[in-house]
């Protein structure tokens, strides 16, 4: 059944507030060139995020990285761009959350030769869109210093718009030239509408495939299999957090039904990362796999489509929670 993507009222639940998909975003694809033969970790998102944060601190921190006692914490570029400070937060958010940006890299290659092309994607939301030059400079300096423990050095060739719409195209950066006129900002609501049109034009059972690990609790336990209620509510929470980030104190709606999972194939997955701020190694754990649905309530579909772009669960800033929706018998899209 066709339906438009609209804001969802929660007055029936007694909350009187509205969750909205009117969230600005921009999706950018970075094309880089390796400057020498190099090794990289199989999972690169955590290294990219950590390296970018380190470069931001080196370039901008004026108080010896003592954030807890910093006089300039409200004006801090790193805090605003890297941790995406929110004036108000949902009750379940207790610490700093990196909700304003996502970095994606699903290239599993570990051996790169000089001149090889290395790609990754960055998606910015809300106020983070205005910090593009901060992210760009950090990634540029990361390329000069080297990525990962083997210091893989690279240079940025291009940064391209990579939105779903034909008008979200164009090259923002080529070499040393920034063409900000090609910086094409979209709205999450438009992304949902166009993805829904494509998905509903196909037949077959609905499916969800996690390309990176999902770390999420259901009934106070970390999931070892997929639960439809958890997936839908997880996507709704991410939309809610982005609403708060843009200044809208939205409430999660009450869903009358959830998709029915007909079959699933799940495996456990983990990612090792090094925390420079804590000077320690840690392992992030989750599950990957695919689930096929026997039903797909339309009230849930907008949120699950949004989740494709914004990711769900814990550790999304380290690349977790990326998935694609599909229809069985049709080709899964590349997002």
For the regions a language model picked out, list residue spans one by one.
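RNA-interacting cores
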Residues: 2-335
